Amino acid sequence: MALGGTVNAQTASPQANDPHVISDQDMELLRKDIRSQKKQLMAANLKLTDAEATKFWPVYDRYTADLIKINDKKYGLIQEYADHWGTMTDEQASSFLRQWLDVDIAIAQLRQKYAPEVAQVLNGRKTATFFQLDRRISMMIDLQWASKLPIVQAQE
């Protein structure tokens, strides 16, 4: 998975004309590619039997569909943050923080919702492995985004 990179808390403003800024269409293609790679990574690490796979992948697909909805909000927040960076008021910063925390809570609640369902189709170790991989992949993606976005305080 091409998710590696260095971590820098950037302080420069995101540039709208920067050739490295990704378009909405390119973002959607990137997200689809990540989802495909994630599924391949899950398959390689879970080593499911045919019987497990038959039961697990439909649950995984429902989980992923629900996660996409939450991630749509997350990527909308990232875009909004980039659009307002440098002009963000205290009120906007507080609103951004509340919305970001709501996204984090929604992801945790989604995992809690699906944990018993996954546990019905996989044993305990494979269930734990699935959620561990899911969380690690999400953290790697979040770290990639965090390293590219300037911090709020830097706009002063």
What are the residue ranges of the model-derived segments?
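Sec/Tat signal peptide C-region and signal peptidase I cleavage site
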Residues: 3-9
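Hydrophobic transmembrane signal anchors and adjacent membrane-proximal interface regions, especially
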Residues: 9, 36-38, 141
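Amphipathic, charged alpha-helical segments and their helix-to-coil junctions
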Residues: 13-19, 26-29, 33, 108-156
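Amphipathic alpha-helical segments
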Residues: 20, 24-28, 38-121
